[in-house]
Design a protein with these regions (language model features):
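Pyridoxal 5′-phosphate
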Residues: 1-340
């Protein structure tokens, strides 16, 4: 919807997982389209559930399309293979955000694509260092090298260095070892959360996932839950729909009519009925005792929420909760920004 493309959502199959038959049906229905781009996520940033992206790429290629895979959620923990043994399963483009890697904040985004896809004669963002020459009569020639031509202005040297270091750290940690550790953490979290009355895990039937667990609680607003975890226990999690509003309609079984009622209110500035959840991210470096502390905190919030919630005021325009005493900080923070 952000481009000139017609977006086709592939309906999920059983248990909301990828249905390759539905993908093929969509490709057949659009066989007359000259350009067919399969833009898929490698892993959900809401449930941690992986997708069969190589099989999806094969279907795209069999029907004359290309496959672009978003590894934002899984790149810090999983290997990325753009050229598997079967050439029909190759990935035409991948993208990921190194700032999600351990040690990655401050790095730049990464896009890797098959150069045969590039046909533009003018860079997306013209700037310094993108031309071989110019003259006094308005003539010029852009640099042939795609990477240089598309990197106008001063390159992000520090960002690139940090990206490389974060990837190297990932390689040293070993993806197989990280996977094994995440399995242990996910199992521990599932055992505890399933015992807490009123807690509902999204896609709880799938335990083979990355260390991403999203849940909601009966009668507790997700942003209230987030605020209490932070204020009472010093634990930071994310509340909302995690940039996955469309997926959220399936996860929370939101009908078109209900969605319309909610979005109409949002358009009027009232976010009070906007659906969402609490996302807990488990990292391979976490210790068991750290995770147990978080899980115990979740249980405490469920138990004492009826009392603790009275300390907060809800703003329907921001969908946030603020403490009645206001937000305060000690003077030490101010000193960070003083030059003398």
């Amino acid at each position: 919807y952000e481009t000139a493309a017609d977006v086709v959502v592939i309906e999920p199959g059983k248990d909301l997982q990828v249905d390759l038959e539905n993908l093929e049906k969509a490709l057949i229905n659009h066989k007359d389209r000259r350009l067919k781009i399969g833009s898929f996520t490698a892993c959900s940033n809401v449930t941690g559930v992986r997708t069969p992206y190589h099989a999806m790429a094969r279907l795209m290629h069999e029907h004359g399309g290309v496959a672009f895979i978003d590894f934002a959620a899984s790149a810090p923990y999983e290997a990325i293979n753009m050229h598997p043994e079967n050439p029909m399963e190759k990935l035409d483009a991948v993208m990921f955000s190194p700032h999600k890697f351990l040690g990655g904040p401050g790095s730049s985004g990464v896009l890797i694509f098959d150069s045969s896809l590039y046909h533009s004669k003018v860079p997306d963002q013209p700037g310094g260092g993108t031309v071989d020459w110019t003259n006094a009569w308005g003539e010029y020639k852009f640099i042939d090298n795609i990477e240089i031509r598309e990197d106008g202005g001063t390159p992000g040297f520090l960002q690139a260095i940090k990206t490389a270091l974060a990837i190297e750290l990932k390689n040293q940690m070993n993806t197989e070892m990280m996977h094994e550790r995440e399995k242990e953490l996910v199992a521990l979290a599932f055992r505890k959360l399933k015992k807490i009355k009123g807690i509902h895990i999204l896609a709880e039937n799938i335990t083979d996932r990355l260390g991403i667990i999203s849940f909601y609680a009966d009668s507790i607003h997700y942003n209230m839950f987030v605020r209490l975890l932070s204020d009472r226990f010093g634990v930071q999690v994310r509340g909302g729909c995690a940039c996955a509003g469309t997926y959220g309609h399936y996860l929370l079984n939101v009908s078109h009519d209900k969605s319309k009622r909610i979005t109409d209110k949002i358009n009027l500035g009232d976010l009070s009925e906007k659906p969402g959840w609490v996302r807990l991210s488990l990292h391979p470096t976490m210790k068991d005792k750290e995770l147990r502390f978080i899980l115990d905190a979740i249980e405490e919030i469920v138990k004492y929420h009826p009392v603790w919630k009275d300390d907060y005021i809800y703003d329907k325009h921001t969908n946030e909760f603020r403490h009645k005493l206001g937000t305060t900080h000690n003077g030490r923070i101010d000193s960070w920004f003083k030059l003398t």
